A protein has these predicted regions:
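Exposed beta-sheet edge and beta->alpha loop/turn motif
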Residues: 91-141
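Intrinsically disordered, low-complexity polar segments enriched in Ser/Thr/Pro and acidic
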Residues: 29-30, 141
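Short solvent-exposed beta->alpha transition segments
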Residues: 24-25, 31-35, 39-42, 49-96
Length: 141
């Protein structure tokens, strides 16, 4: 893992314990963000392509074009997101104006990973604008 990525991950994991307050966001925003991520993961578990696609931001929807292409990409590229064994929500943070929800996922291979979900407000709803996976510092279970 490149040194910069390690340093960024270490800073994120050690900065503030629990769910950090992000300027301009309420506790209900945090709950809504976690709800969107959780409902999208449940849609993936059911292979509900249209349902999962609905939680993606307009930019992601435009990039993939169809729910089926989106689901296929997640299935191939993000197996821990597509079929997690466990999901644990971490810190909600703000990075250069971006809202990022940290989620600890354990995939079917039992290897923990940290998913960094970039969130975007669309009207009065939250949508997922991107997801980056990094290795967790935890040992697989």
């Amino acid at each position: 893992m490149p040194m910069l990525r390690r340093l960024l991950l270490a800073a994120m994991l050690t900065s503030a314990a629990g769910r950090a307050r992000v300027e301009g966001l309420s506790a209900s925003d945090g709950a809504a963000i976690r709800g969107v991520i959780g409902r999208q993961i449940e849609a993936f578990r059911r292979d509900d392509a249209p349902g999962a696609f609905d939680f993606a931001s307009p930019g992601i929807q435009k990039m993939f074009g169809t729910p089926e292409r989106f689901l296929d990409m997640v299935r191939r590229t993000y197996p821990a997101v597509y079929r997690p064994r466990s999901v644990e929500y971490g810190e909600l943070s703000q990075d250069n104006g971006r809202i990022v929800q940290q989620v600890e996922l354990t995939g079917q291979d039992r290897q923990p990973q940290v998913a960094l979900y970039e969130m975007e407000r669309v009207g009065d709803a939250w949508r997922i604008a991107g997801c980056t996976l990094v290795r967790s510092l935890r040992v697989g279970t």
